[in-house]
Protein backbone atom coordinates (compact mmCIF):
# COMPACT_ATOMS: atom_id res chain seq x y z
CA UNK A 1 0.00 0.00 0.00
CA UNK A 2 2.85 2.42 0.82
CA UNK A 3 4.37 1.58 -2.54
CA UNK A 4 1.31 2.94 -4.40
CA UNK A 5 1.18 6.07 -2.23
CA UNK A 6 4.79 6.90 -3.10
CA UNK A 7 4.07 6.56 -6.83
CA UNK A 8 0.92 8.65 -6.52
CA UNK A 9 2.84 11.33 -4.63
CA UNK A 10 5.59 11.40 -7.29
CA UNK A 11 3.02 11.64 -10.09
CA UNK A 12 1.13 14.46 -8.33
CA UNK A 13 4.35 16.35 -7.63
CA UNK A 14 5.45 16.03 -11.27
CA UNK A 15 2.04 17.16 -12.50
CA UNK A 16 2.09 20.11 -10.10
CA UNK A 17 5.53 21.25 -11.32
CA UNK A 18 4.46 20.87 -14.96
CA UNK A 19 1.29 22.95 -14.41
CA UNK A 20 3.28 25.61 -12.54
CA UNK A 21 5.73 25.92 -15.45
CA UNK A 22 2.90 25.99 -17.97
CA UNK A 23 1.06 28.79 -16.16
CA UNK A 24 4.21 30.86 -15.59
CA UNK A 25 4.49 31.69 -19.32
CA UNK A 26 2.50 34.66 -20.65
CA UNK A 27 -0.48 33.90 -22.86
CA UNK A 28 0.50 33.35 -26.48
CA UNK A 29 4.18 32.71 -25.75
CA UNK A 30 4.22 29.56 -27.85
CA UNK A 31 1.78 30.69 -30.54
CA UNK A 32 2.77 32.57 -33.64
CA UNK A 33 1.24 35.95 -34.27
CA UNK A 34 -1.52 35.99 -36.83
CA UNK A 35 -0.15 38.60 -39.20
CA UNK A 36 0.06 38.02 -42.97
CA UNK A 37 3.10 38.81 -45.06
CA UNK A 38 3.47 42.21 -46.74
CA UNK A 39 1.33 42.17 -49.90
CA UNK A 40 -1.36 43.99 -51.87
CA UNK A 41 -4.88 43.89 -50.46
CA UNK A 42 -8.03 45.31 -52.00
CA UNK A 43 -9.38 48.37 -50.13
CA UNK A 44 -13.06 47.57 -49.58
CA UNK A 45 -14.12 51.16 -48.89
CA UNK A 46 -12.64 52.91 -51.94
CA UNK A 47 -13.15 49.96 -54.31
CA UNK A 48 -16.93 50.45 -54.00
CA UNK A 49 -16.64 53.57 -56.16
CA UNK A 50 -16.12 51.50 -59.32
CA UNK A 51 -12.34 51.17 -59.65
CA UNK A 52 -10.51 48.46 -57.65
CA UNK A 53 -8.10 50.23 -55.25
CA UNK A 54 -5.26 48.24 -53.67
CA UNK A 55 -3.09 49.08 -50.68
CA UNK A 56 -0.06 47.44 -49.09
CA UNK A 57 -0.83 45.60 -45.85
CA UNK A 58 0.92 43.04 -43.68
CA UNK A 59 3.83 42.49 -41.32
CA UNK A 60 7.53 43.01 -41.75
CA UNK A 61 10.69 42.64 -39.66
CA UNK A 62 10.94 44.14 -36.18
CA UNK A 63 13.41 43.53 -33.34
CA UNK A 64 14.91 45.08 -30.23
CA UNK A 65 18.36 44.57 -28.70
CA UNK A 66 20.63 46.11 -26.03
CA UNK A 67 22.28 49.35 -27.17
CA UNK A 68 26.06 48.96 -27.61
CA UNK A 69 28.11 50.99 -25.09
CA UNK A 70 29.92 52.78 -27.92
CA UNK A 71 26.60 54.05 -29.33
CA UNK A 72 25.28 55.07 -25.90
CA UNK A 73 28.16 57.53 -25.47
CA UNK A 74 27.09 59.51 -28.55
CA UNK A 75 23.39 59.75 -27.61
CA UNK A 76 21.94 62.96 -26.18
CA UNK A 77 19.52 60.83 -24.13
CA UNK A 78 21.11 57.38 -23.63
CA UNK A 79 18.75 54.44 -24.11
CA UNK A 80 19.35 50.89 -22.96
CA UNK A 81 17.30 49.33 -25.76
CA UNK A 82 17.63 49.98 -29.50
CA UNK A 83 14.92 48.86 -31.89
CA UNK A 84 14.75 48.35 -35.62
CA UNK A 85 11.62 47.98 -37.69
CA UNK A 86 10.50 47.88 -41.29
CA UNK A 87 6.99 48.60 -42.51
CA UNK A 88 4.93 47.35 -45.44
CA UNK A 89 5.04 50.21 -47.98
CA UNK A 90 4.29 50.75 -51.66
CA UNK A 91 7.21 50.23 -54.02
CA UNK A 92 5.15 51.41 -56.98
CA UNK A 93 1.76 53.08 -57.36
CA UNK A 94 -0.55 54.80 -59.83
CA UNK A 95 -2.33 58.06 -58.97
CA UNK A 96 -6.09 57.72 -59.41
CA UNK A 97 -8.82 60.37 -59.25
CA UNK A 98 -12.25 59.17 -58.10
CA UNK A 99 -15.53 61.07 -58.36
CA UNK A 100 -13.74 64.05 -59.88
CA UNK A 101 -11.96 65.30 -56.76
CA UNK A 102 -10.72 62.38 -54.62
CA UNK A 103 -7.04 61.67 -55.38
CA UNK A 104 -5.66 58.29 -54.28
CA UNK A 105 -2.55 56.22 -54.78
CA UNK A 106 -3.45 52.78 -56.10
CA UNK A 107 -0.54 50.59 -54.97
CA UNK A 108 0.79 48.14 -57.55
CA UNK A 109 3.79 46.65 -55.72
CA UNK A 110 4.76 46.27 -52.03
CA UNK A 111 7.93 45.66 -50.03
CA UNK A 112 9.31 46.04 -46.50
CA UNK A 113 11.18 49.32 -45.97
CA UNK A 114 12.06 51.88 -43.29
CA UNK A 115 9.09 52.99 -41.17
CA UNK A 116 8.42 56.72 -41.50
CA UNK A 117 5.14 57.02 -39.58
CA UNK A 118 5.25 55.35 -36.15
CA UNK A 119 2.69 57.16 -34.00
CA UNK A 120 0.59 60.22 -34.60
From Swiss-Prot:
GO molecular function: follicle-stimulating hormone activity
GO cellular component term, pick one: extracellular space
Segment forming the signal sequence: 1-24
Disulfide bridge partners, by residue number: 35-59, 38-88, 56-110, 60-112, 87-115
Gene3D superfamilies: Cystine-knot cytokines
Pfam family for this entry, one: Hormone_6
Tree of life domain: Eukaryota
Glycosylated residues in this chain: 80, 106
Subcellular location: Secreted
Keywords on record: Disulfide bond, Glycoprotein, Hormone, Secreted, Signal
Coiled-coil ranges from the UniProt annotation: none
GO terms of biological process kind: G protein-coupled receptor signaling pathway; positive regulation of steroid biosynthetic process; regulation of signaling receptor activity; thyroid hormone generation
Record text on subunit structure and interactions: Heterodimer. The active hormones thyrotropin, lutropin and follitropin are heterodimers composed of CGA, a common alpha chain described here and a unique beta chain which confers their biological specificity to the hormones: TSHB for thyrotropin, LHB for lutropin and FSHB for follitropin.
Family: Belongs to the glycoprotein hormones subunit alpha family.
Name by which UniProt lists this protein: Glycoprotein hormones alpha chain
UniProt gene name: CGA
Amino acid sequence: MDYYRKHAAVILATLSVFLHILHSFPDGEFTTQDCPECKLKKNKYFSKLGVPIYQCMGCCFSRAYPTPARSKKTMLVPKNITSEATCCVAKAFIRVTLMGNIRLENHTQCYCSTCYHHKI
